Amino acid sequence: MVRQSMLRLCLHISLLIGVFQPTYALPHASSSALYGWASANGNDESSQLAPLRGSSTLLGVVQDELSSGNSAEVPQSAYELAPGQAADADIGIPFTFKDTQNPQPIRGDLGSTDPGPRTYAYDRLNPNTFAPPSSDNGEVTQSKWPLGLSHNRILPGHAGWSRQENTDVLPGATAMAGVDMKLAPWAYRELHWHQANEWGIVLNGSVRVQAMNEDGQTFTDDLDVGDVWYFPSGVPHSLQALGLGSEFMLVFDQGNFSDGGTGLITEMFLRNPKEVLSKNLQAPLEDFDEIPQDQLYILNGTPAPKDVKEQTIPGPGGVASGNDSYTYHLSKQAAYETPGGSIKIIDPVNFPIAKMFSAALVTIKPGAMREIHWHGTSDEWGFFLAGNARVSVYEAPTSGATVDFSAGDISYVKATASHYIENTGDEDVVFLEMLQAPRFTDISVAQWLKLTPKQIIKDTLHLPDRLLDNLSPNKQYVIQGNRNLTALSSGSGIA
């Protein structure tokens, strides 16, 4: 009896061991499953495919794990250097990767090849970021935003689009923001107003602007390419493209400005009870049955009369004119010519209503440069309308960075940070330089050197007399240069 009981106990124990014994199974040798985030059976880790996670045997030292089949070096036969790229990095030749096979981050004896992964289009657009001159040092506030990377708001009926730059994408640009907007022929920018002050310049086509201020003064004007307008905070206004459409750049004096936060007349009507609208406008309730049920922002419109006077409605305060005018026809202002290009200045001196908006529209010929300078009291917000350029920004005490710019890029340089703009292409650079200041001013480094006692300069920088004697006591703004950008590759000569 005892023996039978013992046999039954042993049998039960054997069965229990069989139930709880863990089973280990290896994937079948013929399995062709690929490693990835999920197997062919979804997220089922119990399938016979490779597991989502590896085993503990992969931790730490694994013998014979290296493979000689993947090299981080790009063979010399697979790339070429751009003209001027092999020159001493201290010279900082402004070379281009435009026609270079497989560009590499090499300058003189600095750098090494890059096997990727890479986006070659970025490298070609930014040779001085990819292979910077040796004068670059430390960290500098990010100074570039390509508008081509801004999200584009496109409107129904092919009426237009809008994209913007603000501190969301360029965090250091705290004093100003930009909006690039396009209106199709006869399309409107909806009646609106802003908390920020608005300065605008026409980039393409032509536009009719209309506004009314607190004193009941009205204003209507037609603007062409290069012309400017300004609307103070709170002044309601509208824009209508004329027959060829219009694109314009808007600059606002708030770095965190968003055009999505604009006050719109459609939204204002929607956010008031119809009873209130009826009482305020002394109109029957049914007159408000057709108001839009959503904002319009940009909308197609009826062609405007050719004569702007037909849409000029004098108010109790009359029509704004003279120093109260909201527009300035910069396209008709003669440019100040220099051997290297030209400059037009528009600030409250000649456009009084734009009290703290001072700008320079600068043209730089190939090989020339906007001289090294800084602005003492204002950050500089810039927009490149044409051409290719590079800018080196020096931020005290020891930081410097060189950045490439092309048409459609926005630049931003902090107050007192020195910088220049050098044309690195074969066409003119056209650049808008914007300040928050009552007058457009800058500090010219060359002028400073000339107007400082020579011995102080010689003792400090060890510059020769011939250099100091050749400097002008006047600002040059745009300095002529050699169109052959690689002329100094040998280490001698004048740029």
Q: What spans do the regions from the language model cover?
A:
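Intrinsically disordered, low-complexity regions enriched in proline, serine, glycine
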Residues: 191-193, 210-212, 219-220, 241, ...
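Intrinsic, low-complexity N-terminal interaction/targeting segments
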Residues: 160-162, 166-170, 177-180, 189, ...
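Active-site-adjacent segment of 2-oxoglutarate/Fe(II) JmjC oxygenases
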Residues: 245-305, 428-483
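Glycine- and acidic-residue-biased ligand/ion/polar-headgroup-sensing regions
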Residues: 185-188, 193-215, 366-397, 407
